[in-house]
Amino acid sequence: MDKKILIVEDQDDLRLLVRLSLKSLGRIVLASSAAEGLEKVRAEQPDLVTLDVWLGKGDSGLDVCRAIKSDPATAHIKVLLLSACGQQSDVEAGLQAGADSYMIKPFSPQSLGEAAAALLAA
């Protein structure tokens, strides 16, 4: 069975990079805002969500992650946070929000693919 991956990223170029990096792992669904991301999480029930920590317009990927993990219908979904914020406190905040993994930008397409594949296999 094909895996389903939801990419939540507000920047078009990064959304495309993540999509190209992960397309071999399954069916890709895209969202460009926190609200659209949560709507698609509930409707699509993806196996993995890649989630930008800062989604623009004051939206926080950490809040989206908390919402995913606090809802019994979606708590099982793996979340991979992506952020340019690489301080230890940022990583800890992401993991405390419920993320299964945290990657610091910039990253290579290969390292993103490997991290996503590991989460999908877990």
Model regions: which residues?
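Conserved acidic carboxylate
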Residues: 9
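Two-component/phosphorelay signaling modules centered on CheY-like receiver
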Residues: 12-29
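Acidic, metal-coordinating helix/loop segments flanking the phosphotransfer/catalytic sites
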Residues: 30-48
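Acidic catalytic/metal-coordinating carboxylates
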Residues: 33-36, 59-63
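Short amphipathic alpha-helix used as the core "switch/output" element in two-component signaling
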Residues: 39, 62-75
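Alpha4 helix (beta4-alpha4-beta5 surface) of REC/receiver domains from two-component response regulators
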Residues: 63, 86-101, 114
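C-terminal output helix
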Residues: 107-116
